[in-house]
Amino acid sequence: LVRSRGLGDVYKRQHQTVRKGELSTIMKLVFDKADLVKSVGIAMKAVSGKTTMPILECILIDASSNVIKFTSNDMELGIETIVTGMILERGIVALDAKIFSEIVRKLPDNQVTIETDENLVTTITCEKAKFNIPGQSGEDFSYLPILETSDCVSISQFTLKELIRQTIFSIAANENN
């Protein structure tokens, strides 16, 4: 799930002492733009449009383990997707989904680096483009429940499409029907 795509020694980070006034990087990730756009698009489907809880307008980027996960939750629907990328420094940050999505979609087709400092300011870099956006702590984010996968049903894609095709006539054309 996590791959390096030949970045190898270019991104190996040596521990450096941080001078007074400088911020250290607490998370650093590298993605291919296409993988990032696809994953952000999936996560955006569960981002709340209007809410009294600002954290629900965010996508949680969790690179605290060996995989990178994007999670969004509107308290009715939750989505967690695993993103292909390289973890250079582990960390967690919640970013405003709308701003993050707009930035990612407009970046050049190249490698994208996402870095977050100790103040949760996140820098998104791709070629000459560089954006700084404020992040939020992932502690306030509403995590999805862990589901037991022992009770599952598997059907083929063809069967599912056929079931939908045979029943789609019964849905209402609008809310009033």
Predicted segments with their positions:
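Structural preference for solvent-exposed beta-strand-turn elements
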Residues: 15-177
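Single conserved hydrophobic/aromatic residue that forms the stacking wall/gate
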Residues: 1-14
